Amino acid sequence: MGTQKKGPRSEKVSPYDTTTPEVEALDHQMDTLNWRIWIIQVMMFTLGAVMLLATLIAASSEYTGIPCFYAAVVDYELFNATLDGGVWSGNRGGYSAPVLFLEPHSVVAFTYYTALTAMAMAVYTLITAAIIHRETKNQRVRQSSGVAWLVVDPTTLFWGLLSLWLLNAVVLLLAYKQIGVAATLYLGHFATSVIFTTYFCGRGKLDETNIKAVANLRQQSVFLYRLAGPTRAVFVNLMAALMAICILFVSLMLELVVANHLHTGLWSSVSVAMSTFSTLSVVYLIVSELILAHYIHVLIGPSLGTLVACATLGTAAHSYMDRLYDPISVQSPRLIPTTRGTLACLAVFSVVMLLLRLMRAYVYHRQKRSRFYGAVRRVPERVRGYIRKVKPAHRNSRRTNYPSQGYGYVYENDSTYETDREDELLYERSNSGWE
């Protein structure tokens, strides 16, 4: 009997497998559509950042047709409520004094920091878009929109653009001395900035999901991993520091609104600003440590931003209370020590939170044996190697530039430029016990 030939073995397809050519084509079309929408959002965000920077430059110059300097919100030299120069509040002692606000150069510094940070983030997203386009052409990335959303998702771009346009309107209103309207509009800018910073830090997902997605990106492209990982962490810290400054501004803007509409006394308006700033800052630092730090472990932006805000507000408060000492002493003699004590306690709290975050980040990276921990451990060795290279070169340059020429020129501290190997060995032994 002849042997029966077996036909080709048919492949069994799982009923749960929906990967068909039609589905792949549909996924590709949706990915292309999402990618193009994301590119449009990036362009609009870049336009918003450019317009904000252009508005600040125009509002800072007297030759652009804008009537007033936007940063001069209050004028402590004027004591007449009928003059324009800021928002004014009376008191029981018969005086008339402006409310507490930042000095003009501080306002300029913070607003330009906001604009430059937005410009840097716009350049960052444009570079990311170019690299994703290149990697997609090289067949290293399949879903370009998914990788783009790991860097900046569309929700973040939307709220970021809205916050930039609101700040642009605030600057123009301040330049036209519409202080009350500008202060009210800044409350909306603060709300959008909170949403923008929150989404930019966490992408609206759980921390473990973000960590796994970024880790898997290393297999596709090292450049994209660096953009979505370490580089993005730097921008998160910049935005976190900016959020602390926004808390300072919204506290003072709320003070302007209260003083302008409720006509409160001098000490009442200052108390509103100080209580709002201290409360929001403490809540922000705690939320950053308990929630946001799970996404970016080396998150030092909130503490540093709060520390800078305390120093800036302390400088403005000192100048304010020095000029208006008489009405303050009449209304509330305890206002000056209370303000100083509040700012000092908040500054100490921000330093404590900064040290706590650095310690927890170090412990986390040491347990994970991450690349960041390895890079940190190599820093002292690199510094010592750099010092060994610089010291002999510096010593030779001194002897070359100052020859003795027979005069017996002697350097008293010439031994400080020589490398003492015994000290280095003792230093290494002393550090070995800590490893």
UniProtKB/Swiss-Prot annotation:
It is found in: Virion membrane; Host Golgi apparatus, Host trans-Golgi network; Host endosome membrane; Host nucleus inner membrane. InterPro entries: Herpes_glycop_M (IPR000785). The chain crosses the membrane at residues 37-57, 112-132, 156-176, 179-199, 234-254, 266-288, 295-317, 335-355. Keywords: Disulfide bond, Glycoprotein, Host endosome, Host Golgi apparatus, Host membrane, Host nucleus, Membrane, Transmembrane, Transmembrane helix, Viral envelope protein, Virion. Residues 1-36, 133-155, 200-233, 289-294, 356-435 are intravirion. Interacts (via N-terminus) with gN (via N-terminus). The gM-gN heterodimer forms the gCII complex. Belongs to the herpesviridae glycoprotein M family. This is Envelope glycoprotein M. It comes from Varicella-zoster virus (strain Oka vaccine) (HHV-3). The lineage of its organism: Viruses, Duplodnaviria, Heunggongvirae, Peploviricota, Herviviricetes.
